[in-house]
């Protein structure tokens, strides 16, 4: 899980979602998981 100020999809499988006002990227590649913080 990477914590960054700007989250962007890295590949075509990355999905940007909002969970309780936290922006997250979920992907089948574990390396691409991100959250905004």
Swiss-Prot record:
| Record-linked SUPFAM superfamilies | Ribosomal protein L36
Q: Which is an annotated GO molecular function term of this record? A: structural constituent of ribosome
Output the GO biological process annotations, alphabetical, semicolon-separated.
translation
* Keyword annotations from UniProtKB, A to Z: Ribonucleoprotein, Ribosomal protein
- What InterPro entries has UniProt attached to this entry? Ribosomal_bL36 (IPR000473), Ribosomal_bL36_sp (IPR035977)
NCBIfam families per UniProt: rpmJ_bact (TIGR01022)
Q: Of which family is this protein a member? A: Belongs to the bacterial ribosomal protein bL36 family.
Annotated PANTHER family: 50S RIBOSOMAL PROTEIN L36, CHLOROPLASTIC, LARGE RIBOSOMAL SUBUNIT PROTEIN BL36C
Q: What is this protein called?
A: Large ribosomal subunit protein bL36
What gene does the UniProt entry assign to this protein? rpmJ
């Amino acid at each position: 899980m990477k914590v960054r100020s700007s989250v962007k999809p890295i590949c075509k499988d990355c999905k940007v979602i909002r969970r309780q006002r936290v922006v997250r990227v979920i992907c089948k590649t574990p390396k691409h998981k991100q959250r905004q913080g």
